[in-house]
Regions:
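N-terminal single-pass transmembrane signal-anchor helix
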Residues: 12-38
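Ser/Thr-glycine-rich phosphate-binding loops at phosphate-binding pockets of nucleotides
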Residues: 16, 41, 73
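A generic short alpha-helical patch detector that favors 3-5-residue windows
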Residues: 26, 49-52, 73
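N-terminal leader/signal peptides at the extreme start of proteins
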Residues: 1-15
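Low-complexity, acidic interaction segments enriched in glycine
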Residues: 55, 59-145
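Aliphatic-rich helix starts adjacent to a transmembrane/signal segment
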Residues: 37-56
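Conserved amphipathic alpha-helical interaction elements at protein-protein interfaces in regulatory
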Residues: 7, 40, 44, 63-67
Length: 145
């Protein structure tokens, strides 16, 4: 059994300044350890999402090519997977169930056909939306697996 004096239980002062500072320091240390891990996991999740979306585009583009006999031109863009471009008799889309997704940084994907690296190139320019960069700003492409 734990014995407490009435004087201690009725003390209205609460926590001392030193105790509060110690608690704040401990919370700060824990946040300093957890936050970088969380940020790295978020970056990895965005990378995986972008690669999955590019693969989805690739599957839809291949189906488009099987129906039409070619990939959409750069001018037709990825929108040709959702809306029939003019003059295509054998278009049997839409080839995507939903509207074209933006990349995880809320920017549109870049599409070129013919591409420099294959029949088409699809690129997400990362967080900064410009070519090149490292980390969150790096480009994620259809030709790099």
């Amino acid at each position: 059994m734990i014995y407490h004096s009435k004087k201690y239980l009725n003390d209205p002062r609460g926590f001392t300044l030193v105790e509060l500072i110690v608690v704040v320091i401990i919370i700060g240390l824990l946040a300093g350890l957890v936050l970088p891990q969380f940020i790295r996991q978020e970056e990895k999740a965005k990378l995986r999402t972008t690669k999955a979306q590019i693969e989805l585009f690739g599957t839809a583009l291949d189906t488009f090519r099987l129906d039409v006999g070619r990939y959409p031109t750069t001018d037709e863009g990825l929108q040709a997977l959702r809306q029939k471009p003019g003059g295509l008799e054998r278009w049997d889309g839409p080839y995507l169930r939903k509207d074209l997704p933006l990349d995880p940084w809320s920017k549109p994907y870049a599409y070129r056909s013919p591409g420099e690296h294959g029949p088409y190139d699809i690129v997400s320019y990362g967080a900064d939306g410009t070519p090149g960069g490292d980390g969150d700003n790096r480009d994620i492409t259809s030709w790099e697996k």
